[in-house]
Amino acid sequence: MTPSAKRRTLNTHYFMPPHVRVVELMTSGNTAPEIMSLLVDRMKTVGLKPFVAKRESTGFIQNRVWASIKREMLHVVAEGIVDAQTADDIFVETIVRPGTRPFAAMDYVGLDTVANIERTYAQERHLDTTYTVDYLQREFIDVGKLGIKSNKGGFYPPSTAADAVSTKPRIFVLDNGLSGQIDNLKQGKILEYSFEGEYIRTVFKDQYLPDGIAVSQEENVLFWTCMGSPGQKDGMIYAGKLDGNDIRPLIQQGIVHTPKQIVIDEANKKLYFTDREGLCIWRCDKDGSNLEQVVVTGDNNNECDRRDATRWCVGITFSHTLGKIFWTQKGASKGWQGRIFSANMTIPPGETAAHRKDKVCLLEGLAEPIDLDFHESTKTLYWTDRGEMPFGNTLNRLRFDDRGYALHTDSTPHLKHEIIARKFHEAIGLKIDARNEHVYVADLGGSICRCKLDGSDKVRLVFQEDRAWTGVALA
């Protein structure tokens, strides 16, 4: 190879499966620096994530790390400590799913503690400490860099060390199965994506038009609704573990009509969900028992009522701060008949779900409001609207005062509420991440988006044209 050709030669490593967009770049020993920079820029423009090794290394970066993981995994199985399935499971639960970053985790534990642990392993297994304990002692511990507990930081600067180990939520989203070839209506799926929007796995499949989803952080359980055939009394409510096991029906067919959004009241161990053609809102225990109606908007045995879309309950949320439930009655598709209501979480004495004097219409004439969520600390109601422009396919919010009265605004002309994000494609699912001050929106067009609580910094995390997203939840 000529000297000129050597300067244009380098090592690359692409990853499988194809949705992993990482590529490693490494010099051949003669590669011109400008060639490396050029390739990094070009790869970023086509959606790849390039990583450059600083020097030549057998296995590049990731396979060097992966080799050591494989060695230890083989050791714990070969030594009879655990079986392969259990070793895989604990690795996924403690490293993969939380998105644990090894160096950030070491900073969090403390580098002096890490060194002591490694020293014990080295003594027990007669390991060389040159690149572990000795390296930590010389480069970090001796100069006072112990991780987040020291003002000098560790592998990360002190201001970012704690942030680097903060848990980012996993995204669970429903695909109703209607965006591809439709052979039957039981092609819905529950999928998991990372905080960055990378596909992780399909949790459950073969679902009958799934629509609403919620996560119990206390129990690591998913709850979701399946609409069944629209207009028929064959909707169902399911629960299943986050790991994809123990799926079970909570509400069997023949009880509810078309269940839509579902939310969890962890404080009272209750589930709330709307029933579109059932013309009501239901509440039950987390095991499906003690099912009761809390709001009724019409007679579901009456054909006229059942066909009246202004009576259809779709979105549901609640606020313990205000002691209220909120729900949407969407109206006809793109019909500008949508309304948002509130009522007390407890039915007033002497009243019934069908006759409640505490029921209040907060907003009316909306394009087509769908799912809801409530941000407690700011007393703000958020919702998606899948109606037409100029006010549809939007993310919206309405603030409340301490007494629970709506604070109407004129920030958007002709409206009493705020539109904070636009240009969704049939916006449906909605979930607030209060910890990180984010809002997630899923739409039927195949996009999952995230923005700040004020609607700024909107980014599309996922776009899959062959998906029709409905509900979205976080864990």
Swiss-Prot record:
Enzyme Commission number(s): 1.1.-.-
Enzyme class at the top of the EC tree: oxidoreductase
A Gene Ontology molecular function term of the record: oxidoreductase activity, acting on the CH-OH group of donors, NAD or NADP as acceptor
Top-level taxon in the UniProt lineage: Eukaryota
A GO biological process held by the record: fatty acid metabolic process
Disruption phenotype: Significantly reduces the production of T-toxin and decreases the virulence to maize.
Cystine pairings recorded for this chain: none
Residues where CoA binds: 149
Keywords: NAD, Oxidoreductase
UniProt pathway annotation: Mycotoxin biosynthesis
SMART domains associated with the record: LY
Alphabetized SUPFAM superfamilies for the sequence: 6-phosphogluconate dehydrogenase C-terminal domain-like, NHL repeat, YWTD domain
Stored InterPro entries: 3HC_DH_C, 6-blade_b-propeller_TolB-like, 6-PGluconate_DH-like_C_sf, 6PGD_dom2, LDLR_classB_rpt
Residue sites binding NAD(+) per the record: 99-104, 245
Residues in the signal sequence: none
Official protein name in the record: 3-hydroxyacyl-CoA dehydrogenase-like protein LAM1
Organism (species): Cochliobolus heterostrophus (strain C4 / ATCC 48331 / race T)
Gene: LAM1
